[in-house]
Amino acid sequence: MFRAVLVGISGFLTLASNAQKFESLAQTPPMGWNSWNKFACDGINEKVIREMADAMVASGMQQAGYRYIVIDDCWQVGRDSAGNIIADAVKFPGGIRALADYIHSKGLKFGIYTCAGTKTCAGRPASLGYEYQDARQYAAWGVDYLKEDWCNTLKGQNAPASYTLMRDALYKAGRPIVFSLCEWGSNKPWSWAEDVGHLWRSTGDISAVWNTPANPDGSPRSGSVLGNMDLENGLEQYAGPGHWNDPDMLEVGNEGLSVDESRAHFSLWCMLAAPLIAGNDLRNMSDDTRAILTNKNLIAIDQDPLGRQGYRVSMKEGLEVFVKPLQGGDTAVCLLNRGDQEKQLDFAWKEYGIGSGHSIKDLWKDRQTGTTDTRFRGTLGRHQVIVLRLSN
């Protein structure tokens, strides 16, 4: 069967002109919650997912812009005699459609997970050879967002072809579904996925760690806030409305990051125009976690309709400066101290190509703080950020 599948995949280009993705979706980076970072495989069930939807509303996250509740791996257990995917009846006794209906009743959207290989990363049934059948099932269930992973693929399986096949299947099924590609940047999806999906992973998996050692050749290594962020450098040209680089889900609120590190993590993802997919337990958030995830000033930077991904303009002795052009001529600036020592800031804006005449708003302090006519001075503690909005 898999030989036939590969033959079918290899011929996808002849059909590409007759298929497309849902172009109107994800005009700004998707915002939501995914189960994996906190609950992994064993922790998910119908009760947990319903409670996450309730908490997204009650916590103010929905009002802040979060929309998607996404079940990651381990919701599926097999296929019936007709090949239809079967959900785990123990974990999800009410069924997936009823769960989707509940989430929709909250004014939220529902997402689910699959894999392009023979099995998912956790060894559950995947979609290889069942793309059109699964897409029809997702549409019937009321799915609004699909994450497709890249585990257990066949030798020689072609990533662009495989993901294009699922794109076509989703489009034919007729329900607008945001398509999230998750092949960890292994096949440089930024170079081919703009017309395939709405977002693509550009890094390996993240964890709740501030930094990871570089690879032997000096290149960044994923698995941390800074490692995943560094891997975004140079990819800004590929992001825009409807097609986003994805440095992986947020670890804000998960054990392992300090409050300062969580604030920096969130700030950097907003500067990168990254999808804001929370990965913590929404039912038990600290005040600090809630304040970070719902900060209206930072979310406005991420969701800016111009859709430009921010980029690094300076990196010197552990101090990094990022800029992000915004609609209407404003500019967001992020100052990051990635090092372990406090830094004293004292610079002229022209050092970073920014002219005079701009008013400055400190987005975390939520207050105006001068203009670019004078030197910027301040203190930046270890692993801290200052995020500023410059306006004409």
At which residue positions do the language-model features occur?
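Aromatic-lined carbohydrate-recognition surfaces of secreted/lumenal glycan-active proteins
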Residues: 108-124, 171-188
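Hydrophobic h-region of N-terminal signal peptides that target proteins for export
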Residues: 9-18
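Aromatic-lined carbohydrate-binding/catalytic grooves of carbohydrate-active enzymes
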Residues: 38-41, 52, 56-155
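Carbohydrate-binding surface patches
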Residues: 269-272, 277-279, 315-354
